[in-house]
């Protein structure tokens, strides 16, 4: 098995020029000189890698030897330069003004002089051909200048005391490398980018320390592979992500000396045909040692199977838990990637089983027959044990089979629906795999008007135990959820008690899903750009929604309306009546034109899309260009571009693009400048109010305690004179 993309580098230091400075006396001049480094990087070497279902190898090495490029180019050090001949302006006996000085040894300076010193702009040429053009200050290259070597290599940028210091660009003709960025005392240090070939397919952009890649940076290799993360001494070290484009693999996690070591996640992407759908990608998350899976880790297989346990040198070894595609579970000892004991059941078959061991009454489900293969396939075992428990034990197997047959009749459509909704909000994917999330599943339920059967979306989610809208759903889980929802909605309308699960599922498919699926509504997923922009605020909105749910046992439309009032967001554009009409588009039960019901519970998707609706109502149109602040030439250029674009684009597309840009600006303005700042201010005010109230309570308590103590002391003082008199009389 190949190790993961190691990067070797020499520890050779990059010597920088020594400088010599000699002050001139009327007829002598001195100059700082330096030797300039020619930076390079190594070749992008690759070796073969083997990938299999059980043991997937890590990607090849990308060795990066650093050698000849970082050797210095020595420039003569000028210890004492005597002017043999001078041609130019003078002031008295001093060189002053423009002139040409010919130095002993064949060196020449042409440029500005001031009181006998090279000062101002000039050109200095060494006898070996090295040339400096730029600023001089008191005989020293200082400011901005250009070094040019005899072979054509150049440095252009800031110079301090004759050394590259500041921002500059170095081009090496021999190695075709280019560095552009910050320098410190002649060495690459700070932010900079290095291109290692003429095609600019091999480069590094990031932080440098002492001529080495160190800190945070991004490295693109000639093969197209990319690493972005932390570096130390020219090798990957710390947290980082490496993507092997040629192998469709990615590792994200910890690195030590160029090798995957510590905690990390390795993903194997899978290409698929347009009509196929894998549940997920092969992905390992856990411990790595020397680029191998070693220690504790979890492997998610693309088929839906899952292994969680111990690993040793890339193989399952030790105690582990394996969940098969059909939901069966084996827990025990593994040895060299194999189960130490064959499980008591047939892993590839599925009958009336309990796919998840944490379901209630799993022993009953496990006792059912598993000798017959499921018509849906071994990877599509339904998890509806909670519904089967409502059926008499004698009829459970028949009920389960009839549900499977009902699902089988619609399997093609169900797969299309899963693929369609899982791709909402995604423009592209490296592996074309989009696991469905609960947020997308919520959109599917709203599109199919499932919530219009006397049950809210939030109540539906309580039935299937949803804890996060961003959790992925496997196809078998998605179908199981639909069956559970169908039963709770339709079972009262089914007269016969026989095959009731299949009847409820078929009714929901016929009345709701088939006519309405894939007709996307709402503010979030109606356009890919809408989702791309809005999802930037989903995490923060989820935090706010959770906080509101904690504050209220049930978060309803009424609480949402009052929240906007507390945040002082209502104005002429955003009013309560407009808000209610917007919310009732997806949920007609909120407002039927005459009556309003504000006590309906809101799910997170409804909450998030309600915020997006508020952004549309409240947002003002933002112009892309402010013509009052744009000069005439730029206006003419913009006008010509607009005319050219209009010629290529139809009026309908131009209008749609304008509307889309307007929506993006309004959404960003609402969240960044209105809603989120107002909510954060409200939280701070509440915290400060609570703190002040707590301080007031504390002070009041202290005052009561002090008063009580004073009263006790006063009661004690009334007895003190008697005691004193007694003592005095004794004396």
UniProtKB/Swiss-Prot annotation:
Signal peptide: none annotated. Residues 7-17, 722-731 have a biased composition (Polar residues). It is found in: Cytoplasm, Cytoskeleton, Cilium axoneme; Cell projection, Cilium; Cell projection, Cilium, Flagellum. Residues 18-36, 46-57, 363-377 have a biased composition (Low complexity). MORN repeats lie at residues 86-108, 109-131, 132-154, 155-177, 179-201, 204-226, 227-249, 251-273, 284-306, 307-329. PANTHER family: RADIAL SPOKE HEAD 10 HOMOLOG B-RELATED. This is Radial spoke head 10 homolog B. The lineage of its organism: Eukaryota, Metazoa, Chordata, Craniata, Vertebrata.
């Amino acid at each position: 098995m190949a190790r993961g993309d190691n990067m070797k580098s020499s520890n050779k230091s990059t010597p920088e020029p020594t400088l010599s400075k000699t002050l001139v006396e009327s007829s002598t001049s001195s100059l700082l000189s330096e030797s300039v480094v020619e930076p390079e990087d190594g070749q992008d070497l690759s070796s073969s890698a083997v990938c299999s279902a059980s043991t997937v190898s890590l990607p090849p090495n990308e060795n990066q030897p650093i050698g000849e490029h970082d050797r210095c180019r020595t420039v003569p050090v000028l210890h004492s330069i005597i002017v043999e001949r001078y041609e130019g302006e003078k002031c008295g006996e001093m060189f002053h003004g423009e002139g040409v000085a010919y130095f002993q040894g064949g060196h020449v300076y042409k440029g500005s002089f001031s009181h006998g010193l090279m000062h101002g702009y000039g050109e200095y040429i060494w006898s070996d051909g090295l040339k400096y053009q730029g600023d001089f200050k008191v005989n020293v290259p200082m400011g901005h200048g250009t070094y040019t070597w005899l072979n054509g290599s150049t440095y252009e940028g800031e110079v301090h005391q004759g050394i590259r210091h500041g921002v500059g660009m170095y081009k090496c003709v021999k190695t075709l490398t280019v560095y552009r960025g910050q320098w410190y005392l002649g060495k690459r240090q700070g932010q900079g980018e290095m291109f290692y070939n003429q095609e600019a397919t091999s480069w590094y952009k990031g932080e440098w320390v002492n001529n080495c890649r160190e800190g945070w940076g991004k490295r693109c290799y000639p093969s197209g592979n990319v690493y972005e993360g932390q570096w130390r001494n020219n090798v990957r070290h710390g947290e980082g992500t490496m993507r092997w484009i040629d192998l469709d693999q990615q590792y994200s996690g910890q690195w030590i000396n160029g090798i995957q070591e510590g905690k990390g996640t390795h993903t194997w992407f899978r290409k698929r045909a347009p009509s196929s759908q894998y549940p997920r990608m092969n992905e390992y998350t856990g411990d790595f040692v020397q680029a191998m899976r070693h220690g504790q880790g979890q492997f998610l297989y693309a088929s839906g199977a899952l292994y969680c346990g111990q690993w040793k040198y890339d193989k399952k070894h030790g105690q582990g838990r394996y969940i098969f595609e059909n939901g069966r579970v084996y827990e025990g000892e593994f040895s060299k990637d194999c189960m130490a004991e064959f499980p008591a059941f047939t892993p590839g078959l599925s009958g009336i089983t309990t796919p998840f061991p944490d379901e209630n009454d799993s022993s009953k489900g496990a006792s059912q027959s598993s000798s017959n293969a499921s018509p849906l396939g071994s990877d599509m075992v339904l998890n509806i044990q909670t519904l089967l428990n409502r059926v008499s034990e004698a009829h459970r197997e028949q009920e389960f089979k009839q549900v499977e047959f009902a699902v089988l009749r619609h399997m093609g459509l169900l797969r299309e629906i899963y693929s369609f909704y899982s791709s909402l909000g995604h423009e592209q994917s490296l592996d074309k795999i989009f696991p469905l999330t609960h947020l997308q599943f919520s959109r599917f339920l709203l599109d199919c008007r499932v919530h219009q059967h006397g049950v809210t979306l939030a109540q539906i989610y309580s039935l299937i135990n949803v804890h996060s809208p961003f959790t992925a759903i496997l196809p078998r889980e998605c179908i199981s959820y639909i069956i559970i929802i169908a039963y709770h909605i339709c079972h009262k309308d089914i007269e016969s008690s026989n095959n009731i699960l299949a009847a409820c599922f078929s009714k929901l498919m016929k009345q709701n899903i088939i006519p309405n699926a894939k007709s996307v509504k709402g503010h979030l997923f109606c356009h890919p750009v809408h989702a791309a922009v809005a999802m930037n605020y989903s995490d923060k909105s989820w935090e706010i929604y959770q906080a509101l749910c904690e504050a209220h046992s049930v978060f309803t439309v009424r609480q949402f309306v009052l929240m906007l009032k507390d945040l002082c967001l209502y104005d002429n554009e955003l009013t309560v009546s407009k808000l209610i009409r917007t919310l009732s588009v997806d949920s007609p039960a909120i407002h039927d034109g005459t009556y309003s019901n504000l006590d309906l519970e809101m799910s997170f998707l409804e909450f998030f899309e309600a915020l997006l609706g508020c952004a549309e109502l409240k947002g003002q149109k933002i112009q892309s260009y402010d013509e009052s602040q744009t000069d005439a030439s730029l206006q003419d250029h913009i006008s010509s571009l607009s005319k050219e674009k209009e010629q290529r684009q139809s009026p309908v597309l131009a209008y749609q693009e304008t509307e889309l840009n307007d929506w993006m600006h309004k959404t960003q303005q609402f969240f960044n400048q209105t809603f989120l700042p107002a909510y954060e201010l409200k939280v701070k005010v509440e915290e400060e109010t609570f703190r002040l109230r707590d301080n007031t309570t504390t002070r009041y308590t202290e005052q009561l305690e002090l008063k009580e103590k004073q009263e006790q002391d006063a009661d004690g003082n009334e007895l003190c004179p008697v005691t004193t008199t007694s003592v005095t009389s004794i004396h």
